[in-house]
Structure formats: C-alpha cells, structure tokens
Amino acid sequence: MYRVRVFGDPVLRKRAKPVTKFDEALKRTIERMIETMYHYDGVGLAAPQVGISQRFFVMDVGNGPVAVINPEILEASPETEIAEEGCLSFPEIFVEIERSKRVKVRYQNVRGEFVEEELEGYPARVFQHEFDHLNGVLIIDRIKPAKRLLLRKRLMDIAKSARG
C-alpha cells in the first residue's frame, strides 16, 4: 500500500510525464494503487497522489477497478453539472465543483492497448477529477476564491502535515 500525498506536497502540482513502459513493474504499481484506493474508500487515485509523477490513474465507479494510462479528453460536453467532490489529498474537505456532464476519452490499458469510450455523469466526473491530478490541478483550483478563503485554515493544516 502507498502513502497518499496531501496538499502541500510539491508532486501534486507537477505535470506528470507519459508512461512509456508497459511492464510488470507498472502492473504491480497499479495493483498497489488499487489496494490503496480501496483502503481509503476512494473511487479514484492518480499516480501523483502516491508520489509517482506519471500519467496514469485508477478508478472504480462500481464496475470494478480500471487502470487509465496516458489519458486524453477528446471531447467535453458544454452541458455541465455541479456536484460535491472529495479528494484523498484533501482529507475531510468536500467542495462543489462544476464539470462537464459527458466526456469522450482515450487512454491505454495495462497492455498498452488504446481504449476509447464515452463517459457520462459520475464516471465522467471521476475521470475528469483524476485527469486534473495528472496536470497538477487540484480541487481547490476549481472553486471560487471566497470558498478557498473559507477553507484557508484547514488547507494550511493539511499542508503542514505534508511537510511532516
């Protein structure tokens, strides 16, 4: 199992690098990430959240775990919806985030094969959330400044814990 990195850890702000090797080490890393995600009752976990600055994440929105490697969002619907999101890198913080209702995505699986699919509703939201992590974008970047100000003390406490 991995230790989940929390707000304040610099790895969360970096743009992750593409995965180039689809080997046993990647499979083991993904298995460990899935174990970590379930341990913390998450529905998604991006590699940067466990200190790995590479473009992949795992998610499970009810149909079993999926590894998403080198993802792209090909299309995002103009229709959006607002819903509450949490993040393992922001313990006990939940904020309302506006995201596209539908996305058309392409990614590679653990064998390096390309997968293309359309996601709607909750699966689309989770995909977009985890995709943000690969670009160094966090949930607090997607909320209004006034709301961020209200969370300032809690964010500072989390950042302090990241430094040990």
From Swiss-Prot:
Provide the reaction this enzyme catalyses: N-terminal N-formyl-L-methionyl-[peptide] + H2O = N-terminal L-methionyl-[peptide] + formate
Q: Where does Fe cation bind?
A: 87, 129, 133
A single GO BP term for this record reads: translation
Record key words, sorted: Hydrolase, Iron, Metal-binding, Protein biosynthesis
Q: Which residues form a coiled coil?
A: none
Q: What is its EC number?
A: 3.5.1.88
The record's SUPFAM superfamilies line, in alphabetical order, gives: Peptide deformylase
UniProt xrefs under PANTHER family: PEPTIDE DEFORMYLASE
Q: What does this protein do?
A: Removes the formyl group from the N-terminal Met of newly synthesized proteins. Requires at least a dipeptide for an efficient rate of reaction. N-terminal L-methionine is a prerequisite for activity but the enzyme has broad specificity at other positions.
Family to which the UniProt record says this protein belongs: Belongs to the polypeptide deformylase family.
Check the record and name the NCBIfam families matching this protein: pept_deformyl, PRK00150.1-3
Q: What is this protein called?
A: Peptide deformylase
